[in-house]
């Protein structure tokens, strides 16, 4: 990988906040260094628990995972630590730990999630997905980065804050560790409504994002929204012999392939009419992604052209993107000479900031139904909608975070958009309109979150803990949220 400085990432002003001027930054670094091996070992213990919030996986593992997280938080001296929801209620187990503010100090909410994505084929991993391994300066394993690293970053930052400032720092801290984020947070709105007072805060940190490059401290300032859908195409009502009926009758996979092909134009840009596409906008307009570096980061094969129009950052952050993430048809190994009557696909549509997700879902449905190949039956089921997100970087808590990131990495921090989605940010914005919501994280282009061989860059992780601990200390010294 090239030096991150070659990516032309402009520095962000990192003026020391007045309420942080007296902090001994080196004391925080030293405290993190003392704790770091222990933190990584504890992270490895969390990685070993295969807590997956999908229906086909064992829910008992999620309970184990929540109990392990609760035990870590109890050890840090929180006044209350509870696993929610209670038995018999809907939703997979989350953990809420709270210590109230004292002396008029603000309260912060630290979010992460303990559930993980399925590992895929374990044999495809270099090492077992649920056995954390250190290798080449990284920690490998499912959830090592997304998002059990976020869980342990919160635990470690709270630990370091207490070690350096003492237990009477006065900052109100609530840690909320969700248990079904990778399943789309289906119960988040209801959970938030039931626990609104418990989760109330002046500033919120969502530790579930990434850095621009290894070695570049980053605050994510915008996210695309999301629409998830399943489309099924059917041409006949039963299986047919491919020799006896092939020709006049097209099989389900062919019909579906033709329908999917209408979703992009000849340049590879999304062709769903009416979707907002900010081709000329790069978010904050500052970061530029070198195409050679992008191809290396993404593993694009030689000779394969990149899709879409406009700058790479606009294609990643401010334009829609549509991917086929699942496809059901007869498997190659069990196929016979028959015409399959139907096929279906799962679609993931990322929508630009400013696009209403309900409208985007309607536009996607209308496109699919109006482009039915050869008049085939097309059924569309919308399974998920989530709005885009943008944060106010002029807020004091945001300025504190940009400063803390710069100090932790000893280099200027940057702001970036992200093509992914965290749908519940809109719920948090609605519930707590005065709170600054800050999206941080420790993934990088080599992390492969959700993929085979997920990993965490350990030195950046060390710095991320320093940054969060410094931010907490700055918040403790502030009279404002």
Task: Give the ranges of each region predicted by the language model.
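Histidine/acidic-residue-rich, glycine-tolerant segments that coordinate divalent metal ions
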Residues: 169-251
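Acidic-enriched catalytic cores of C-N bond-cleaving enzymes acting on peptides and small amides
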Residues: 242-327, 355-377
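Short, solvent-exposed beta-strand/turn "edge" segments of beta-rich domains on protein surfaces
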Residues: 248-249, 334-341
């Amino acid at each position: 990988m090239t030096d991150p400085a070659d990516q032309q990432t402009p520095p962000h002003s990192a003026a020391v906040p007045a309420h942080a001027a007296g902090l001994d930054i080196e004391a925080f670094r030293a405290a993190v260094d003392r704790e770091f091996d222990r933190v990584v070992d504890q992270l490895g213990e969390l990685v070993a628990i295969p807590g997956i919030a999908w229906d086909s996986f064992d829910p008992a593992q999620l309970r184990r995972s929540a109990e392990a997280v609760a035990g870590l938080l109890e050890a840090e001296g929180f006044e209350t630590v509870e696993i929610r929801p209670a038995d018999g209620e809907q939703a997979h187990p989350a953990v809420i730990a709270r210590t109230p503010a004292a002396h008029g100090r603000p309260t912060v909410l630290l979010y992460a999630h303990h559930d993980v994505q399925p590992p895929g084929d374990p044999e495809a991993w270099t090492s077992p997905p649920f056995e954390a391994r250190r290798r080449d300066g990284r920690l490998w394993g499912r959830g090592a980065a997304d998002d059990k690293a976020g869980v342990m970053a919160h635990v470690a930052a709270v630990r370091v804050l207490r070690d350096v400032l003492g237990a009477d720092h006065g900052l109100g801290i609530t840690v909320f560790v969700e248990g079904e984020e990778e399943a789309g947070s289906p119960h988040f709105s209801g959970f938030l409504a039931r626990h609104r007072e418990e989760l109330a805060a002046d500033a919120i940190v969502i530790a579930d994002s990434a850095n621009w490059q290894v070695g570049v401290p980053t605050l994510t300032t915008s996210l695309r929204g999301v629409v998830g859908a399943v489309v099924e195409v059917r041409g006949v009502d039963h299986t047919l012999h491919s020799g006896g009926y092939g020709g006049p009758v097209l099989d389900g996979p062919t019909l579906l392939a033709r329908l999917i092909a209408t979703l992009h134009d000849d340049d590879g840009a999304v062709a769903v009419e009416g979707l907002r596409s900010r081709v000329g906008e790069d978010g904050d307009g500052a970061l530029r992604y070198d195409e050679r570096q992008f191809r290396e980061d993404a593993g694009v094969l030689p000779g394969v052209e990149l899709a879409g129009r406009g700058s790479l950052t606009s294609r990643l952050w401010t334009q829609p993107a549509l991917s086929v993430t699942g496809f059901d048809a007869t498997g190659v190994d069990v196929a016979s000479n028959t015409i399959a009557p139907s096929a279906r696909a799962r679609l993931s549509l990322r929508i630009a900031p400013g696009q209403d997700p309900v409208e985007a879902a309607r536009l996607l449905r209308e496109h699919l139904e109006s482009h039915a190949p050869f008049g085939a039956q097309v059924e569309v089921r919308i399974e998920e909608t989530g709005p885009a997100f943008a944060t106010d970087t002029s807020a004091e808590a945001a300025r504190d975070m940009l400063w803390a990131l710069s100090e932790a990495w000893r280099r200027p921090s940057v702001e970036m958009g992200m093509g992914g989605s965290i749908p519940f940010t809109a719920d948090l914005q609605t519930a707590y309109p005065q709170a600054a919501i800050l999206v941080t994280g420790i993934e990088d282009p080599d992390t492969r979150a959700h993929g085979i061989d997920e990993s965490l860059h350990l030195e950046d992780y060390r710095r991320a803990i320093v940054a969060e601990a410094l931010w907490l200390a700055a918040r403790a010294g502030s009279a404002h949220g």
